[in-house]
Amino acid sequence: MYLNTLAPAEGAKHSAKRLGRGIGSGLGKTGGRGHKGQKSRTGGGVRRGFEGGQMPLYRRLPKFGFTSMKAAVTAEIRLNDLTKVENNVVTLESLKAANIITKDIQFAKVVLAGEVKGAVTVRGLRVTKGAKAAIEAAGGSVEE
């Protein structure tokens, strides 16, 4: 076997359809587009969801739900992020100073993810039960 003798398997490659190249090709004249109509024209076609003037499905169905704006100002804090804060006292301001959360965050909750290394004091943040147990097991404390 040589590189210059490599070839695809028989029947693995199909030649491209050459549209509009004579009636003998089977794809001459209209080129597989049929006769007249919007889809036969250059640039022709309808937008997504268009059903020919019938009320489309996405407008027949009712609207539902909403996007909570509270999610944009709330952050989850992992346990291993707590050690990145100076002075081992974790508050909303100290998290912002350590670039763990952005300045537009108004609420934060400490969740049980990762490991807490060393004693830290969490002040003024919401904390899950599991995270509270992990912080206290490491010698830290949670203040309201």
UniProtKB/Swiss-Prot annotation:
Entries under Gene3D superfamilies matching the protein? 3.100.10.10
Q: Which keywords are on file for this protein?
A: Ribonucleoprotein, Ribosomal protein, RNA-binding, rRNA-binding
| Record organism | Mannheimia succiniciproducens (strain KCTC 0769BP / MBEL55E)
- Composition skew (Gly residues), residue ranges: 21-31
Q: Per its database record, what is this protein's job?
A: Binds to the 23S rRNA.
Q: How is this protein named in the record?
A: Large ribosomal subunit protein uL15
Q: Which InterPro entries match?
A: Ribosomal_uL15, Ribosomal_uL15/eL18, Ribosomal_uL15/eL18_sf, Ribosomal_uL15_bac-type, Ribosomal_uL15_CS
Assembly description: Part of the 50S ribosomal subunit.
Q: Which family does it belong to?
A: Belongs to the universal ribosomal protein uL15 family.
Q: Name one GO cellular component term.
A: cytosolic large ribosomal subunit
Q: Which residues form a coiled coil?
A: none
Entries under Pfam families matching the protein: Ribosomal_L27A (PF00828)
Provide one Gene Ontology biological process annotation.
translation
Note down the stretches annotated as region Disordered. Answer: 1-53
Q: Which GO terms describe its molecular function?
A: rRNA binding; structural constituent of ribosome
NCBIfam families, per the entry: rplO_bact
